[in-house]
Amino acid sequence: MPMQGAQRRLLGSLNSTPTATPNLGLAANHTGAPCLEVSIPDGLFLSLGLVSLVENVLVVAAIAKNRNLHSPMYCFICCLALSDLLVSGSNMLEMAVILLLEAGALATRASVVQQLQNTIDVLTCSSMLCSLCFLGAIAVDRYVSIFYALRYHSIVTLPRARRAIAAIWVASVLSSTLFIAYCDHAAVLLCLVVFFLAMLVLMAVLYVHMLARACQHAQGITRLHKRQLPAHQGFGLRGAATLTILLGIFFLCWGPFFLHLMLVVLCPQHLTCSCIFKNFKVFLTLIICNTIIDPLIYAFRSQELCRTLREVLLCSW
């Protein structure tokens, strides 16, 4: 993967553009036409990564500490936090190496840097794939708990959850290794885009179906108690708003990154696409933001987990 001036992206296989300068302005492409280039300062990028790192470490520690949280659902949430932790940690490591190389504080041979680059690439890609997979696994788990409530504990057992988790990690590591090895092939990038779209469709279908079932249940309760219809409509609106936020955050945080991959395949030399490529670091930052938001959506809404988290924090003091 090529050098990108003084700063080089260790995900250079995905980013064919130089790192942005610390401002927001119009940068010229190779034809001199202006391009909107949004720069993310290194300090902000590292700060967001640190927040994500601390947040997800706390989630993993809380789930590991409390045996009541060793259920399949919390195992998936723990693995989501762990994969998000690796996403933010690998990007922070990448940025730290870039800054050290740029400052001349890290002097090493090119072969060593290349090996480190490949290692971080595999770690980053596998953790991203794991994060997407566990978001889908959580959606499936919630779907089964609602539509097969009486059989849930016989369907989603802890051994099955552990096997699914192991399969996700192994498949993610193997596929990311192949991705790094064959990153110049368009089919590889398209497979990643298709995978993202499949996860998006899966989550949308499952959560919309769950919302429809919840609305039917609420409607049945209102009829039983002879209440007015607006109460049910209010519940439906709240559920729709929650669903929109959930899927909207997922799409807004992950979509630009996979749009970048798709454009690398479809229009690598097009002027408009080249302008989009200049904002690659913004797309990575959005993914880091998603790793910060995930615990707020999936973990911290649990009273049991929050109580354990307070115990962990008190013990650390």
From Swiss-Prot:
General function of this protein: Receptor for MSH (alpha, beta and gamma) and ACTH. The activity of this receptor is mediated by G proteins which activate adenylate cyclase. Mediates melanogenesis, the production of eumelanin (black/brown) and phaeomelanin (red/yellow), via regulation of cAMP signaling in melanocytes.
Glycosylation sites: N29
Gene of this entry: MC1R
Main subcellular localisation: membrane
InterPro entries per UniProt: GPCR_Rhodpsn (IPR000276), GPCR_Rhodpsn_7TM (IPR017452), Melcrt_ACTH_rcpt (IPR001671), MSH_rcpt (IPR000761)
SMART domains: 7TM_GPCR_Srsx (SM01381)
Domain of life of the organism encoding this protein: Eukaryota
The name this protein goes by in its record: Melanocyte-stimulating hormone receptor
UniProt entry keywords in alphabetical sequence: Cell membrane, G-protein coupled receptor, Glycoprotein, Lipoprotein, Membrane, Palmitate, Receptor, Transducer, Transmembrane, Transmembrane helix
Subcellular location(s) per record: Cell membrane
UniProt topological domain (Cytoplasmic) ranges: 64-72, 141-163, 212-240, 301-317
GO MF term (any one): melanocyte-stimulating hormone receptor activity
Record note on quaternary structure: Interacts with MGRN1, but does not undergo MGRN1-mediated ubiquitination; this interaction competes with GNAS-binding and thus inhibits agonist-induced cAMP production. Interacts with OPN3; the interaction results in a decrease in MC1R-mediated cAMP signaling and ultimately a decrease in melanin production in melanocytes.
GO cellular component terms given for this protein: plasma membrane
Bilayer disposition of the protein: Multi-pass membrane protein
